[in-house]
C-alpha cells in the first residue's frame, strides 16, 4: 500500500488544530528535522517536541487554510495561511510555504516552513 503523504500532512494539521502535541509528534520519524525558517532548526524528536511545547504554551488555538498542495513521491509542498490565536487574545494570520519529506513508513523526516517572522510578531505585539 502506498503512503498518502498529503493525507498525513492534513492529519498533522488536524492535530495542530486540537493543540495535541502528542498527536503531532506521532507523525515524525525519530531523526526528523523541523526547519522552521527563520527560527532555529530542531533536529530529532526531543528537540521538535521542545519547540512545539514552546509554541503551544502561549497559544489558545490554531487553524490552517491550505491554498495549494502539490505532491510528488515522498514530498508534499504547500502554500497556506496559518492562523495562531494567543492566550493574550491576540491573533496572527501568517502566509507560509512548506515542504514535507517522508520516509518509507510515512513518517515526516523533514518539515521545512518559510514565513516572515515580522508578520507574526507585529500581529501579536
What are the language-model segments listed below?
Residues 1-30, 124-125:
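Short, low-complexity N-terminal intrinsically disordered segments enriched in polar/charged residues
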Residues 21-74:
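A solvent-exposed, acidic/Ser-Thr-rich amphipathic alpha-helical stretch
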Residues 33, 90, 106-107:
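Residue-level signal for well-ordered, solvent-exposed loop/turn and beta-edge residues enriched
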Residues 52, 64-69, 81-82, 95-101:
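Hydrophobic/aromatic beta-strand elements that line small-molecule binding cavities or substrate pockets
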Residues 78-80, 113:
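Polar/charged side chains located within well-ordered beta-strands of beta-rich proteins
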Residues 84-91:
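Short, cysteine-centered beta-strand-loop-beta hairpins and adjacent loop/turn segments enriched
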Residues 95, 99-122:
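Short beta-strand edge/turn micro-motifs at domain boundaries
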